[in-house]
């Protein structure tokens, strides 16, 4: 049973954020307004919504149920998270980003007791259009074209561009987190599930007195670039699948992520085989190569991606029929494995990038710092001797 937190009086009605604006082509260096003032309602969610047992999906941190606004009968999606700092962070980052037209919109947030535990309940718009690749699989005989692939990548790119501009890395951009608002032809594609989202900070390591990076020179890289590059790698994989129907990396042994597949990802071993790639331009293949570079710091940034002619001028991209829908249909029974492989690859990448942190100055082996430390100790010893 859901109930409001004991001893709490309901606040003034939760201010619903304005509905997302229609998608607009982003300028080269967009300036985004960040939503602020997340207010969490303490009254029981059942005061305002009818909660059903229909499960719409499973997020990384909780299940998603269908609910209805009691006043308007409008349907929404409800995500339930056990209250903890990680859940609060997910809600906060998602709230900040939900103004973007290509990110699922948060309507309300509640703090309620459920089975004696404090939970956060996130009311979101209901995305009824299904997953990106399911929609392409279900097209029937209608050809899927290169121009459509370009338009889809532009939509996903706009979501990532918005996030990166407000210093958020999603870190879990994958097929099942890309959903359409409805089954209609003009439905909007949206990014969901902020369970792995991370705030990135753009500090200059050179001016930080107490730390020094040990993985690379401080002027080259701050850790935030690794988190954002994870999203760029995902864009490369999704773009590759859109253009041919199968992933660039795969497991030979039916495992979620085999050692061989891990090696291929790290070594960047993939091909553009015919017939699926015979009609795709070299320019597009080069765009994928720049997204799937093995060295994260060399990957294309989201600004570079959005400024690429294939993305920026999607209306001029040729309507070349692709093999994608046929291949996706033929390999339908293997699609769950493909999704699992990408989930595992992203998990591996997040773990790898977490290792690339900043080392405390006491543990660093910078020769200049060692010399200064030795000199400081000598001065201290001399002072003690007197």
Curated annotation (Swiss-Prot):
Active-site residues, record numbering mapped to chain: 172 (proton acceptor)
Mutation effect (residue 329 to R): Leads to constitutive protein kinase activity
Protein name (Swiss-Prot/TrEMBL): MAP kinase-activated protein kinase 2
Subunit details: Heterodimer with p38-alpha/MAPK14; this heterodimer forms a stable complex: molecules are positioned 'face to face' so that the ATP-binding sites of both kinases are at the heterodimer interface. Interacts with PHC2. Interacts with HSF1.
Region annotation (Autoinhibitory helix) ranges: 314-350
Residue ranges annotated as motif Nuclear export signal (NES): 331-354, 342-351
Positions where Phosphothreonine occurs in the chain: 208, 320
Catalytic activity: L-seryl-[protein] + ATP = O-phospho-L-seryl-[protein] + ADP + H(+); L-threonyl-[protein] + ATP = O-phospho-L-threonyl-[protein] + ADP + H(+)
